[in-house]
Every structure is written in C-alpha cells, then in structure tokens.
C-alpha cells in the first residue's frame, strides 16, 4: 500500500479485540448491550488536570468503520475465526451510542471522558482506536497548555514536526497543541487540513547559502518585508547577527515605513542574549522588533529564563512539546462499567485490583461539574448513576470517595453535565466546532480552575466525587467480590 493511499483503520486494533469478539459471537454475547468508560488515572507531569482532545478523529473513524474484503481474507488466513463470524464482520457497522466530553475541556483522573453503549462486539472492537486518539492528543494538548501558561501571555508556536514520532504524530500533534493554546505551528499540512496557522522564519542553511550574513538577511528582507524575522545566531549573535539585522532593517524596512519585524535565536544563553539584543534593537530605534527563541524549550525552561529577565516575545517549542518528552504516555484506559441483562436491567460491573488506584467506578454514569455562581470557578466534579439528577437550586453534600469523613456542602452553584451525545444508534448527532472555537473554549474552561489547581508543582487536588448511591454500589461490589 502506498503511503498516500487512505488506510482503512478498522483493523487498527489489538488482536485480542478480534479473538474476544469471536468468543462473544460464538458464546451468545454478540448482541448483549454493554457500557464502557474511557478514562485516565493520573495527570501527566504531576499536573492538576489534563485537556481532552482527539474526539474529531474518533468521529471520522466511527463513521468509516467497516471491514474490507482484504481484511476478511487476512482474518480467514489466520484459521482462528468461524465463517459465520467473518460474515458478521463483512457486514459490520457501528450501531451504538457514544457520549463524550467536548475537546478542550479540562479533565481529571477517574472520570469518563468517553462512554460507549453498544453491543459487546461493537464496543470491544473500537477500544484500541479510541484510546489511541485520546491518549495521544490529550497528552499533547495538556503539555501545550502547560507551555502556554508558562509563557505568560507571550506567543507560543509548535515547532516539533521533524522530531515527532511519525507523520500522524506531527500532523495531529500540531492540532492538539493548538487546542491546548499554542498560537500556530510550523507544520504546513496541519494548516492545510485543520486551519492551524502555519508560519516560520528561516533556517541556518539560508544564512550559510550566501557569502555573508548581511547578504542573506538583505535578500530575505527584500522578499518578505511585511513578515521579516531574521535568524541571528548562525555565527555570532551579538557581534554580527543583531548588528546585521539592524543594518538590513534600516536599509530595507525603514524606507518603506515598516516598523514591525523580528529576530530569532536558536542557541546560547537565552536570558542573557535576549536582554542584550533587546537593548541593541531599542537603541537603534527598533522598539517594535520582536524577539523569538527556540532550542529544546519546555514549560520549566520558559519559566526559568523569564524569571531571569529574558526579553522574549515568542517561543518556538519543538521536541519537548510534540513528544511530551517529560512524560510521553497518557495513561488512558477503557473498562467495562455495566451490561444489560436478559430482563433489560443495567447491571454494574467493577474491576478490582490490589492497587487501589486501579479499582474502577462501576455503572452507567453521569458526570457533572459544579461551578460556583459567585466565583465562576470549578468546585468539584461529581459522578452519579445514570438515573440520578442534580438539582442545582438545592444544596448538595459531596464527600471524598476514599476518605469519606471529608464532607462539604456545596451551595450557590451551577451543575453542568460534561458529557454530550456524539452518536445515537450509530448516527452522528454532534456538530463539531471549528478548531479555533475548540481552542477558545479550552482557554475559557482552564480559566475556571483555581490557580492552586493549575500549579506546575504540587497542585491542589481537584476532587471527582461520587454520589452516595454510586458509592454504595461500588463498595457493595467490592464486598461481594473481595
């Protein structure tokens, strides 16, 4: 298959999804309605929250879900599956329901980002791809949001395509970084596909191509006078790079009345060099010249150099963002929460572990976020059984699901149900917002979190509480199965 030929991603699944599905088919469970939750157990980098991303690619996948003739032939050659099961797969389509938290929403451990209600085989076969999408893009969106917050209002561009772990990681990573708050990307195809504004300056090769740095700068400035950012560290930033940039700005831009321009540094002591460069530019009258920096940046380095007085207007953040280098795995999991029995009753299911953090919250659930009416800040998230409702005109007592004696009465609040319907009976019912709308929503929602929750180090725990009914069901199942 050529690299430009569209892949049928239905077969992008762990092989045991197929062997289990075959078992469900042969043992009479193929039509049994099941409920699965996709959630994660801890925030990356020890942070206080994560950012949901990846839903749009899941929607596209579900809509195109089918097994091709080649897929069926491959599975037949494995000599593991019955002809009846292969015939079922040949006519396979998704007929279930999916609810999800919208992209850009701050999310917390142990709460369902996605809930699937579908026949057992349908729900099982989509597990791998759902996790792939959410785990990758939520990881990058979360890292991007940390970087953007560290930059304290300065522009942040995603610069990591060449260091990404594959083409999809570069393309979708740029999308996720934009959701998390980045202002644009260097990845051209992400602009073409998603509208993530692509931009860039020059590489050192441009400067080296000419006989002198001055000639390289002048040629570039003459070509792009309205968008001129010069890379000043090819030879010597302060002795030649910045002086040559100022000379070219004076010769090319000043006669045209253009005052907006830029320089970029990709090496050296960013705090020291940007302070000196800013002084030189200002003394030459180029006070509107922006200073951009790159070079293995992350949120901690950005924080440090800004504390040291760095004079920077724009950060280009590459490998440590696009690979989430400090913690390159988002631990999303997909677990069975309930099944429907022969009498049509929803029966809760639980997964128990010696590791308390791996014990699941059972049942088909609703997820609420309580927002204080007086502060506009998030108070807590609240999980309850599907047939419960929250009346936010009434006070409600919430409690720590582990340290149950820690209780709090919430009043003067608005209860917002976080999950929204995406598919109903296999039909798409959700209208996806534009990427710029998702980014705006993300920044607005992050602003509803208290600063204590947003700390990079030792953030305050944000609680995801259980209703009394859900807690009773969970601990009843623990007693029954322990």
Residue spans for each PLM region:
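Buried, small/hydrophobic-residue-enriched core segments of structured protein domains
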Residues: 1-33, 42-44, 80-81, 86-95, ...
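Gly/Ser/Thr/Ala-enriched C-terminal appendages of enzymes
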Residues: 2-32, 36, 45-47, 52, ...
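Residue-level "edge-of-site" marker
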Residues: 204, 294, 318
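Short coil/turn segments at secondary-structure boundaries
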Residues: 73-74, 142-146, 160, 454-461
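N-terminal, Lys/Arg-enriched amphipathic/low-complexity engagement segments
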Residues: 34-90, 99
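Hydrophobic residues within beta-strands of alpha/beta enzymes
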Residues: 199, 263, 291, 313-315
